[in-house]
């Protein structure tokens, strides 16, 4: 995607380079920026990351209907394959992910997430119609039976019965059909024939602790009878990822696993005709069929696979977008068409094997600011993470450039030489970007597949190591990772806070790494603290706490460890003597910051000052009393908690709404 110069930024910065340098120019020394005479100086820098991230695609005739992800309002666009242009845009009044998508009779059916108490099922036939609501659900998948009945499933947090299969019809509205897996954390796939509806469940989020693994259920539509038809080879996998009816004689089922599996069933009696592993693949997502040829895509590696139904042969047909996470696959004659989450459409000519790709924004998709994932800054560059990309803001030039990154850059850190390191979800590991050398971010090291969700990445100034805290969505727990930049060899310490706690917070100081724990499940231990020698790879101490909540962020300033809990409580630990045998950490001062802090706040130690950020506000903490002084109200829109960065001149960067701002405190 070419450099863009947002009009919003032009309005805010005027002449671009001159304005940026005059407002954000470096002070004489690399120290925290001096406060303005009348409080903080705040400069708007335009949308943090403006793009068209996506999460679904369904082909109707010659148009690929593509659902957005993390945009407000949520929307669906029509991409016309013959011309390579976006020809329609439909905005939805509710929702965040447009994840469920299915066609029937030339009509598009949709399901969305994040629509509490409002419609999360829609139909579009040239006019958008709200159909109703699956109660309490983030809708993950929808399917339409031959008679027009719409089926849906999703994630219903806290529901004792587990994820349900729901049906919508004009006569009955939305009704519950079955809830056969109370210990699964979400429903992920549905399909329907004239006689049966199918539900695929599992626990790829908030797993562990006895959560159900992959389960496939057939529901007889006439009687409501439920039968577990999970193929044996799939039972050990994490979740059923896709169920697709491919004619009267074939039902294709895929999983997320290590590796992923595909099973082919006879819809008449649900016999398993064939099942096989897909090597090197975490998730298989979308199917298409013509005669004895089956095509399918994978999420993490961008591979388009071909399977011969007659011989059983399996081969990699193409990699249309390297490392592109696939969210849709269609066929128009001799052309396969798919999409990847960073806003790319690809086509493959089955006759010639030629692959073409198209950026959706260049094709006319309405780019908009997406929810932020991460932020980092140095040397006049600010990076804002999103879905499938980083936005690189060049402050001097006044430009923004899209850097493709598969998945989500959950946290980022810039080294003194300007090299950016990223912890990337899901199961993407550690990535690197060297400005002026790397044309795009590159993967430098893999992590174990189950250690899929980096929460934090920090640099230890004493050892030069990168320190990561990671969450394992599928098994529970997490890991503490140390990594020497450039080595390609991370050291992974699994479950350093026990098998149930993820490592949400990491801080470095005094030659130690300090870890803070949380728990993705509603019950179980959380809030533990630990200290590690990152070079020796050994625990120095560990303690449970009475914080009553998970630890969201940690920072070291002087001889004090400062922390914030996920519900906005500040605390301190005196680190004097923390490396001596017999040291017993004690929670010292405490303060309730609920008045200024939202969920999952973060800390940043900068020079002698301590700053905090939440979706509600940017604030300064008094080192002695923990009293908070609000610097800027934010009402920020992040995907998983606010982030805060500082450059070498002491200028702070975060989001206000979805706009990137620079703050000279």
Language model segments and positions:
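Conserved beta-propeller blade signature
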Residues: 64-67, 108-111, 150-151, 197-200, ...
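Blade-level signature of beta-propeller repeat domains, shared across WD40, Kelch, NHL, RCC1
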Residues: 639-665
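A short loop-to-beta-strand structural motif that recurs across blades of beta-propeller domains
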Residues: 75-77, 120-122, 163-166, 214-217, ...
């Amino acid at each position: 995607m070419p450099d863009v110069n947002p009009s919003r930024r032009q309005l805010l910065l005027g002449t671009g380079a001159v304005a940026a340098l005059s407002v954000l120019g470096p002070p004489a020394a690399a120290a925290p920026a001096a406060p303005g005479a009348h409080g903080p100086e705040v400069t708007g820098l335009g949308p943090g990351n403006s793009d068209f991230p996506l999460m679904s695609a369904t082909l109707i005739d010659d148009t690929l209907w593509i659902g957005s992800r993390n945009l407000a309002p949520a929307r669906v666009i029509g991409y016309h394959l013959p011309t390579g242009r976006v020809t329609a845009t439909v905005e939805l009044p509710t929702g965040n992910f447009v994840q469920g998508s299915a066609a029937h009779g030339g009509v598009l059916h949709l399901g969305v997430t994040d629509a509490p108490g409002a419609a999360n099922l829609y139909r579009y036939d040239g006019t958008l119609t709200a159909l109703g609501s699956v109660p309490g659900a983030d809708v993950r998948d929808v399917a339409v039976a031959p008679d027009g009945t719409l089926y849906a499933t999703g994630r219903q947090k806290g529901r004792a019965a587990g994820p349900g299969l729901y049906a919508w019809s004009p006569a009955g509205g939305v009704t519950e059909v079955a809830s056969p897996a109370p210990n699964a954390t979400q429903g992920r796939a549905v399909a329907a024939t004239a006689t049966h509806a199918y539900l695929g469940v599992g626990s790829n989020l908030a797993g562990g602790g006895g959560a159900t693994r992959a389960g496939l259920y057939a529901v007889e539509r006439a009687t409501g009878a439920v039968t577990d038809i999970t193929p044996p080879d799939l039972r050990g996998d994490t979740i059923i990822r896709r169920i697709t009816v491919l004619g009267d004689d074939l039902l294709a089922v895929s999983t997320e696993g290590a590796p992923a599996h595909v099973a082919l069933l006879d819809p008449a009696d649900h016999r398993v005709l064939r099942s096989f592993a897909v090597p090197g693949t975490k998730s298989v997502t979308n199917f298409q069929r013509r005669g004895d040829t089956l095509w399918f895509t994978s999420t993490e590696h961008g591979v388009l696979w071909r399977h011969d139904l007659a011989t059983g042969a399996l081969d990699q047909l193409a990699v249309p977008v390297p490392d592109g996470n696939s969210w849709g696959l269609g066929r128009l004659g001799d052309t396969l068409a798919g999409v990847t989450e960073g806003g790319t459409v690809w086509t493959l000519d089955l006759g010639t094997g030629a692959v073409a790709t198209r950026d959706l924004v260049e094709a006319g998709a309405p780019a908009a600011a997406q929810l932020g994932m991460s932020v980092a800054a140095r040397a006049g560059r600010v990076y804002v993470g999103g879905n499938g990309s980083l936005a690189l803001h060049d402050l001097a030039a006044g430009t923004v450039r899209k850097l493709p990154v598969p998945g989500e850059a959950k946290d980022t850190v810039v080294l003194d030489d300007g090299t950016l390191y990223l912890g990337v979800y899901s199961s993407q590991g550690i990535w690197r970007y060297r400005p002026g050398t790397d044309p795009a971010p590159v993967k430098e090291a893999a992590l174990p597949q189950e250690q899929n969700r980096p929460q934090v990445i920090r640099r230890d100034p004493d050892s030069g190591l990168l320190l990561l805290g990671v969450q394992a969505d599928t098994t529970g727990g997490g890991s503490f990772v140390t990594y020497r930049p450039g080595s390609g060899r991370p050291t992974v310490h699994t479950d350093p806070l026990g098998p149930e706690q993820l490592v949400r917070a990491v801080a470095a100081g005094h030659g130690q790494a300090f870890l803070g724990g949380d728990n993705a499940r509603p019950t179980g231990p959380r809030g533990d603290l630990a200290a590690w020698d990152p070079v020796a790879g050994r625990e120095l101490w560990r303690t449970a706490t009475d914080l009553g909540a998970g630890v969201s962020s940690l920072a070291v300033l002087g001889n004090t460890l400062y922390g914030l809990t996920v519900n906005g409580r500040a605390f301190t630990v005196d680190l004097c003597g923390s490396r001596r045998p017999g040291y017993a950490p004690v929670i010292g001062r405490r303060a309730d910051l609920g008045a200024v802090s939202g969920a999952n706040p973060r800390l940043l130690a900068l020079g002698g000052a301590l700053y905090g950020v939440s979706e509600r506000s940017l604030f300064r903490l008094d080192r002695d009393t923990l009293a908070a002084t609000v610097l800027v109200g934010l009402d920020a829109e992040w995907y998983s908690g606010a982030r805060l960065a500082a450059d070498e001149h002491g200028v702070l960067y975060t989001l206000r709404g979805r706009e990137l701002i620079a703050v000279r405190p």
